[in-house]
Amino acid sequence: MSKIYSLVDKFLMSDFSEIIIQNLNKKTYENLIIFDIGCYRGNFSRNLKNKLKINNNNFYLFDANKNLDIPDFNYYNLAISNKKEIKNFYLNDFFPSSGSSLNTLVKDDKLWNFTRKLLTFNFKKKFSLHKVQSDTLDNICNSKDIKEIDILKIDVEGAELDILLGAESILHNVSIIQLEILDSKDNFDKKYSNICDLLKKKYDFKILLKKEILSLGFFSSLKAYDVIFTKIRIS
């Protein structure tokens, strides 16, 4: 499974690190604060760290998957959502990096599950239910006295809106967001519009780049985009 994940990460996942770095509004990088929500093994953060040449302590990584261990970063086995409570987390046991979420969109898509099991040659395993602790981004930042976030990456397989709703305060002080927006093909346009309107109108973000994740839509009823948002700067 590790080899399959490495291939998927290398050839199917987009790397936006260069455009993110180019749009950082800071002269030096040593005091950057980077949040990686839905980090899985931490490759997004590790890639940024290597390019920015900064300390591991600049990073805060979160994932609800209890099987992960990321010793080289500040890693928290915690789900980020809109409330502090116990929630259901659905772990994809046949390919944990894809579809594991508080949301059931991927779990419930029969065609996605069948075709991805074909790709992984793993027909016996499925999604398993786990009770996990969740908290809000605002609560986390308050508890750690974090006043601003330079880079916020969110990849949570359909549960992204709840994270934004639990970040009402800190979003005013976030510079760049890399956000995966995922939903069914029938409902995607509505969700995409709602999230973009929220970030543009309430928090003064603009879309810097968007790219459809084509591999997700093949043989499934799902659709997703990776979107880079940056704050509108008044010169």
Predicted regions and their residues:
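Phosphate/nucleotide-binding beta-alpha loop and adjacent structural elements of enzyme active sites
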Residues: 1-235
